[in-house]
């Protein structure tokens, strides 16, 4: 496996983990009555911290990718235009963070928690994921390993950091909450 494949694999793992955490948060937090929230607070903290962290990482990567494309290609270049169109599409990381914040701010007493977490998950698995798929496809056109290193900001330390956050989510998950089976292997 070459270095670009290793980076692509890590990016894929991060997306799988983020999706699993989003589903687990919805499962555990959307229907939890206010009285139970204190018992699952460690999971809530670990899950939302993971999601906020990973969304911020993807946001940084998109900015670096956009900067690289702007430096390398003229404004009329079709590849640059495709990247800029994808970056301008609905489903940004900032929008996902705003929906995550709304879910966290929802009042369990007012029965808005399930609605807000549902909105977050629908956005995350819909527009955010669609936009990510397109950006991932466009990144495939980067031929140089140095470009991949620069854009991804993946190194041994960042992988350990991601795995530590992932392990914290799994360790604090309520017993009746499950992660999707395809994410448990990593």
PLM features: what roles do these ranges have?
Residues 1-56, 60-186:
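Small-residue-biased structural context
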